[in-house]
């Protein structure tokens, strides 16, 4: 299946000059969603992954089905104040400024092999922050998996040393 045909391009969103890649049509189409899940799962099958981690919000949408297919758990990473239990946090760099991410303190056990699943790799800021958070609490980031990669933003360059999969690549 050509997932590129299932990704809607919305010009000038969220601001003028941005060509937004919308994954909603994938989520709406059960065959496209199954295909996406299968492709990520196939990539991870032989990597001995113990747990899937996904950043809010679209990382949840793609990470949970992958975890289900691999018969392993899923751990959400969220913005501050959204998780009800004790958390660990990390500050990470954005294009303009910084932000913070949190994970439950019991979300990952020391030494677990983690795959991070998200919808988009752009500048690499968010996934770099998630990776640091996983490593800070003792997990090993074994793979980074994305539905879409915006290659011209060079997020991959920030993630040297990580095993990266992206299903659809766009040049801006």
UniProtKB/Swiss-Prot annotation:
Family matches, as InterPro entries: Ade_phspho_trans (IPR005764), PRibTrfase_dom (IPR000836), PRTase-like (IPR029057), UPRTase/APRTase (IPR050054)
Primary subcellular site in the record, as a coarse category: cytoplasm
GO molecular function, one term: adenine binding
CDD domains according to UniProt: PRTases_typeI (cd06223)
UniProt record similarity statement: Belongs to the purine/pyrimidine phosphoribosyltransferase family.
Subunit record text: Homodimer.
Protein name: Adenine phosphoribosyltransferase
Natural source organism: Methanococcus maripaludis (strain C7 / ATCC BAA-1331)
Gene designation per UniProt: apt2
